[in-house]
Amino acid sequence: AEYLEQSPKIERVYYPGLASHPDHEVATRQMTGFGGVVSFEVAGDLQTTGQFIDNLSIPYIGPSLGGVESLIEQVALVSYYEKTTEERLAVGIKDNLVRFAIGVEDPDDIIADLEQALAAIPGKELRDKWEQRFRE
């Protein structure tokens, strides 16, 4: 979660173990640990988020959040595929939301995999240039 939070290609990280989480203080008082599931928003759209997930090699893509293997899902396409973007937004599900259940793999390997997958997607500056070019 800390690695993702510092990345410019991640807009937001949802994990109660982070000091930046709005309920971190409550979680610290009530929990003995913060769990192995982290959700985050990729800085991009539905397609960019899918590209990020496709570039990962460690986690399996799937809706389950419990097991020894790392599992990841693009929430809009796996859990809310039958809803339109507008319907998903109405319940707070953005197209760039990712849910990642961390397994027993080596943490350094997981971070390296996240790093290479993030490196493979365009940054905000490049996306802004593309958008400006298409508007002209």
Predicted regions and their residues:
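PLP-dependent enzyme catalytic core of the Aspartate aminotransferase-like
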Residues: 54, 70-136
